[in-house]
Structures are given as C-alpha cells and as structure tokens.
Amino acid sequence: MKTKKLAVIGASYLQEPLVRKAKEMGLYTICFAWADGAKCAEICDKFYDISIVEKEQILKVCQDEKIDGICTIASDVAAPTVAYVANAMGLVGNDYEAAVRANNKYLMRNAFMKAGVPCPKYMMVTPETIHTPEVIDGLRDFQFPMITKPSDRSGSLGVTKINMPSEHYPAMELAMSKSFMHEAMVEEFIEGREISVEFISYKGTHYPLQITDKVTTEAPHFVELEHHQPSTLSDEMFAKIYDITKTALNALGLTNGASHAEYKITNEGRIAIMEIGGRMGGDFIGSDLVRLSTGYDFVKGVIAVALGVFEEPKMTIGKHSGVYFLCKETEAIKPILDDWKSHPEIVQCEITDTELRNVQCSADRSGYFIYQSDKKFTI
C-alpha cells in the first residue's frame, strides 16, 4: 500500500508536534520553510528551503511530489499557502479567499459586521491614511483607552493600549512597523476576561472542542502567561460562545481544519469576538492542552481533515489541563520548574533561558510547564 504524503507548511518548533504525529501515523512528511530555525528539517522525511509565502513555488513542488494532503498548525502566515495548494490540487482545505480573510483582521471584522457577529469597534490605518482627516476624525469616535495592533500578525507583537491622544501616532507607527502589509488596526478596548475557543471543521460542519481561560500581562503588551482548560464559564455561556463561533466561521468561509477564536467577556455579560485564526491555538493549547483535557487528539484530527479521512471527534476524558509560562512577572513559579518531577500533575517542563525578562512579546518568556489533573493546578 502506498505511503501517503503530507506537506507541512512551516518547520519551526511550532510545527514539531504536527510532524511527529504524522510520522507516528506512518505518513511521509515534507516540510517547507526557510532553513534558518527549521527545527523540523531534522525530523521530516524531506525538507525544502522555500519561504512559506512562496505559494506558487510550493505548489509546483507539491504537484511533483504528488502529495495527499497539506496542513499547518499554530501559524497564521502559512494558512493562505495551505489553502492555495489544496485548492489547486483538489485536496481538502479552506477556500483561498477565506484563508486570506482570516489572516487580515480588517477583512475579518468586515465579515463579522456583515454577519452580525459581535466584535469591537474598529478602524484601519495605513502609512497613506495615517495623517488624513478621515483617520483624524475617526480617532475622535473612539473612547479611551483603545488598542492598536498590526492587521496581520498574531500574538502580542506590536499591540499597544492607548490612554491619551499623544500616544496615538507612536502606537499606530509601531503596529504598522510590525505588520507584513504595513497596516494597523485601531479598536475599542474591552475590559473583561479573556478566553479562547478551539474548533475543528470538516466540509462545512463545525465541531467545538474546548474553551480556554487565559491570563495575560497588563497593558501595554498583553502577553499570555497562563492557559487553563476547561474554562470556568457556565454551560449556558459555553453554548452561547460555541454558537457565535460557528456563525463567525461561516462568515469567514472557513470550512476545513482547526480554528482558534479569541474573545473578551465583560462583567456586564457583553461578548465580543476579537479574532479567529484558521489554525489551532499556539502556546500548547491545540497541540497539548485539548488532548490532555478532553482525550481528543487535535493534531491527529487536523491531519485527518487534510487527508480527507476525518471522523467526528469523541471526547474520552474530562480532565483539567493548563500551561504556566516563566518570565520576570511569574518568577514565583521558578521553584516549581526547578523541582517539577515532585509534582505528579506536571507532564512536561522546560526552561529555555536562565535569564528572566519582563515580557513584551511571547518570545521573551523563559520556560513553561504543562499540567493535567482532576482540578485546576493553582499556585
């Protein structure tokens, strides 16, 4: 029987769980990425030193290789290339235009507004428009505080909370400098708890997997410090969030594969979806926490979608799982990482840097530990 070939877009540490799972499933893995930082080049069957945004070049190689499926995890930038190749080769994947929409916060918000999906008030700013009357007048329509962020980046990179008019332009310039398209989003700041939602979809049917409670640093950078599953939200709120997410996925046209939605919920009960990525959540949410809390192998599910052999998810356990990240702000957890083997709940631990820094983005964190237990692991 012919061994199936799976193309993986990206080869950094983020894709390592995907490549290892594919190998475990007996698949032939082909990774595409720049060689610099390509950790998966050492473990995949074949590696191509091609930028993940070079979709035409990657398509040609995939056609020559006669791949059976293509996917990525935890990478927004790779998603349009995955869709482009899948569409061109008749493989399972999202429509290319849908993947582009999900990769641009402005296009995404426009789709949400059209479909009646609750989201923050927003405005786009570019180098050409930043000093125009339209933007100057538009800024007056927002109340302080507000948020600026790149339109096409994930995580906390380039995100700033603005508290006064003098901060407008430095924050917008920063966001544009971090954007691939040099575009900044200005949006209302919503005070409330942060959650994220994991779904997997197959041919237009959406399956909810889990909701994650999040802990972040305060303004201005909002770097994530903790994730915990399942969320402590009520069953009624779970159902409401799942319904909104399905509507949002349909609004974007995302029909296949993993998705990761981020929400804010105010004390008054207002729900606002901040964004959806056409990929699973990073920070171990998709690769580890979902499996540890539900028993469902999310990574294996993503591969099954790509190969067209997906089966409806089955949740086999009901545990608590989570991750704590090490940095200057969380230095109190350092003794736990140093002695993690004495904590039976901890299933994985790594210190990546001996220096603890105040974090401005996720890359500034110096380690982590992942737990699974019958209740939330609290410190």
Q: Model-flagged regions — what are they?
A:
Residues 1-98, 129, 311, 319, ...:
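ATP-binding N-terminal substructure of ATP-dependent carboxylate-amine bond-forming enzymes
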Residues 104-185, 191, 203, 227, ...:
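Active-site nucleotide/adenylate-binding loops and adjacent lid/helix of ATP-dependent enzymes
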Residues 114, 136, 303-379:
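Peripheral (often C-terminal) accessory segments that flank ATP-dependent C-N-forming ligase machineries
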Residues 166, 188-254, 258, 265, ...:
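ATP-dependent carboxylate/phosphate-activation module, predominantly the ATP-grasp catalytic core
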Residues 256-262, 312-317:
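Flexible, glycine/charged-enriched surface loops at secondary-structure junctions
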Residues 269-271:
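Conserved protein kinase catalytic/activation segment
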